[in-house]
Amino acid sequence: MPTAGSKKKAPTPQISCLTSESYTQLDFLPDKLRTKLLPFQKDGIVFALRRDGRCMVADEMGLGKTIQAIAIAYFYKEEWPLLIVVPSSLRYPWIEELEKWIPELEPEEINVVMNKTDIGRIPGSRVTVLGYGLLTTDAETLLDALNTQNFRVVIVDESHYMKSRTAARSKILLPMVQKARRAILLTGTPALGRPEELFMQIEALFPQKFGTWIEYAKRYCNAHVRYFGKRRQWDCRGASNLSELHQLLNDIMIRRLKSEVLSQLPPKVRQRIPFDLPPAAVKELNASFEEWQKLMRAPNSGAMETVMGLITRMFKQTAIAKAGAVKDYIKMLLQNDSLKFLVFAHHLSMLQACTEAVIESKSRYIRIDGSVPSSERIHLVNQFQKDPDTRVAILSIQAAGQGLTFTAASHVVFAELYWDPGHIKQAEDRAHRIGQCSSVNIHYLIANGTLDSLMWAMLNRKAQVTGSTLNGRKEKLQATEDDKEKWGFLQFAEAWTPSDSFEELKDSVFTHFEKEKQHDIRSFFLPKLKKRQLETTCDDPEAFKEKITVASDPRKMATSDSTADKNGCEPEAKRLKSLSTEDHSSALEEGPSLQARATSMEVVHEVKPPLASPALPEKGWQCGFCTFLNNPGLPYCEMCENPRSRAAGRNHLQDNNKNDEDAAQESTSKSDQAGLECERQCPERLEAEQSANSKEEALEGGGEDRLPSQPEIGQLNNSGTLPVRETFMFCASRNTDRIHLYTKDGKPMNCNFIPLDIKLDLWEDLPATFQLKQNRSLILRFVREWSSLTAMKQRVLRKSGQLFCSPLLASEEITKQQAKENNTRRYITKEDVAKASMNKVKSDGGHIRLITKESMTQDSSLKKIDSACVPSLNPCPADLTVEPSPSKGYIQAVDKEGRPLCLRCQHPTCQPEQTAKASAWDSRFCSLKCQEEFWIRSNNSYLRAQVFATEHGVCQHCGVDAQELFLRMRDAPKSHRKSLLNAAWTAKLPLEQLNEMLRNPGEGHFWQVDHIRPVYEGGGQCSLDNLQTLCTVCHKERTAQQAKERSQVRRLSLATKHGSDITRFLVKK
């Protein structure tokens, strides 16, 4: 495929020609990117080009530094490969921006480094995205690969991460930036609190420009000798000659403030809310204050570590002391139903207190702290931005205080302060940035008599230093102090203490008297129900009783109908009758609301076993217009492209010789039951298909039904010049939701789109060619097929990186290509790996070694065996002379040339010269793909994490969000947990399991990873496409059903040994 660089020739930026013709030179940028740039952003690009692509863009947070850096790097694309170093939580947002603004980048050309051994795709990628967390001294394999690649263009986002001269990541990153020909540093806070934090960034861009470190420190950091006790220390934490430093920085740094370039942006209003605390709440804190004062008055102040440890303890005590008042303040804000706000805190105890306040107010929330994976943070941000019911975001200042966008919030609350103004301003501007439509009110909760007062004064002193250095004028955190009497109620807040003991749970657990309630005596006089008629509503036991009564009493059919409509379910008898006597359109009108059933927390669990996957007809379906027999997986007719009706999806095609009425009725009943199961499992899929169908019908219908945002199809002035395509090829991005377009010959069209945008009639990402009806219908057909796939199948298709015409056919082909060997063992063990390695050595020669995480290797004697053997990770015949059962590490094969072989596929992982540099532990796998497949098949925690990244803990059978309930249970006060479980879908679980959820809630109590094809049927050691998320209730029911089926199989097999089954004579032939 042609490379992106073959399209345009980048002009060589000359300093002399950028004075009057600078904006003209920006025409080199892609049209979509150029038109999106604001005037001040264009100035930033010109500033960088004048300095040959080496500068710092230090605009205030929220002014679009990312898009400026992408545009600057695009000018030098002939010099790529490009390295982008970002905080780990910002890797995927950066890739989204790259694919959005540079559509000529193909999915295979962007590489995200996932771990310290993921180096396989670095040499062949044009763009490599790397997280700061991987820049450690023990990442030798990764560092060697990065240095070998010789990146000519480097972007360092949030470059203030390099502030420390002694940090490992600063020492590693410094030579990489210095060696690159172009380097763009991005940060909204170059110095978080002191001028010393600027030196490493300046040194990376222009070595020795400001002299050596000693010279810089003496001149601008007021460096002097200071004594801590008897220890002599060089103190560089001061500031001096700031106006001179500001003038010198202007030559290498461009910085604009929102107040200067975005006058139309609503203002940011800071407000201090002081309040007093009751004496009982600050008792421990006062004792620490007295200890600190004694320590500072002593002639020898003692070790610095002792002083800093005491201050850290006081910081935490301040958080606990004011937590009760913060809870009351949050509850007060939640009384305004239209308010969405952010709450920032630092300590986990304060985050926990804020979360408890939201749960007690029965409001929906998100929480992002250091334990939340970076991929899940994007999902939570989207939830807060788009869901009107999610009203609160509880955020860690360090984990979520930079790089994320929360413009849906109009208020920001600081439950705690932090040590430097840089982090505070970064957190403020999560809401106050481009895209904000209302003024942002920022409230600082300041508890009098605590460390808050000292920290506020310190923040203002540091703000003056950073303001003079970066902006050329003294600044401070200007916040008006609100009326103290207005917030007087906070001083009467109940003290909050962390609930770590089990004493609170003595009266908050379930008992046998609560679980085994006395039954209604009238139930003994009612006929027993069949299993398919039993339905239980997890949240409403009364509704459960009502359904049983209605379903079992035929004299109350009228009441049954009304109840079914109200609860969103149809009785079995009514559903069978309507489907057998009415057409599909009337059935569609009478059907319940699928979306309501999917999103409601009152999920209906049936006693019958859950289906492993959506039920599809075995013999295909017949088009109602052209009568063509279609593949059962296609949602549209292959001949006439008519959308598949839901009636066709429910009914199997009957053979011509099957005219018996009873057989037909039985077939209809079974297929209808399967169709309803499919609806229950995949409501989003059906809704997406209906949405896509309606849009295509609108395109093909009359003029009044066409898309309002697009020109009239067939009446375009230049319609004759736009090419009409017979078909397109597609490639799904590995890391984002975007789909890249190719011609039928596999040539890139340099455009991409998000399927959800097409559903919402947003076509801006696609060129004018797609205004034509035929071209647009191809995209709509793709979106319809793509939406019909499960999230897991979409993920598998993305990771494959292949070109395809039809997502359904491509997914089916991937499933066929994957190994389908029967395996009744759940995981790969170390013994399996050892046997496979031994067999490889037997067949091909070489030797084996024991590798451990400590990088220790133990080589066994060389074994030259000529017998043939196919290496496999499946259990091999145990005919080995050596017992391969290492308690630690893995037995790995090494070939005759000294190359270690992959634990997964037994192919070489690296060359002999690379083996000497890399540790043995880092040479376990040949690629990231093999590594992921191995861990999925051998590590339960990794498997759960991968499934969670796709399905987010939502049950694929009943649609309940089990992860959300787990988070609420984990974060709720222990006294509230019982009421949460009583109102949730977990009421059917055993008493012991419910009480364990109360005492120590964990993810495994609420949702499980289930094998679609059971392990006992050969579905063990499988890939992700055979896994699904099930809530504990559904998983328990499915496990019970599978146990029953296995018992029946064993009983029948035992019976056949002594005679034939009599029931076989009753089966129709």
Swiss-Prot record:
Biased amino acid composition, Basic and acidic residues: 652-661, 677-707
Localization per Swiss-Prot or TrEMBL: Nucleus; Chromosome
Keywords: ATP-binding, Chromosome, DNA damage, DNA repair, Endonuclease, Helicase, Hydrolase, Metal-binding, Multifunctional enzyme, Nuclease, Nucleotide-binding, Nucleus, Zinc, Zinc-finger
Protein EC: 3.6.4.-, 3.1.-.-
Region Endonuclease activity: start-end pairs: 1001-1069
InterPro entries the UniProt entry points to: Helicase_ATP-bd, Helicase_C-like, HNH, HNH_nuc, P-loop_NTPase, SNF2-like_sf, SNF2/RAD54-like_C, SNF2_N
PROSITE patterns named in the record: HELICASE_ATP_BIND_1, HELICASE_CTER, ZF_RANBP2_1, ZF_RANBP2_2
Keyword Nucleus (UniProt): yes
Chain location of the short sequence motif APIM motif per the record: 1064-1068
Keyword Nucleotide-binding recorded: yes
Role played: DNA annealing helicase and endonuclease required to maintain genome stability at stalled or collapsed replication forks by facilitating fork restart and limiting inappropriate recombination that could occur during template switching events. Recruited to the sites of stalled DNA replication by polyubiquitinated PCNA and acts as a structure-specific endonuclease that cleaves the replication fork D-loop intermediate, generating an accessible 3'-OH group in the template of the leading strand, which is amenable to extension by DNA polymerase.
Note: In contrast to classical helicases that unwing DNA, annealing helicases rewind it.
Protein name, per record: DNA annealing helicase and endonuclease ZRANB3
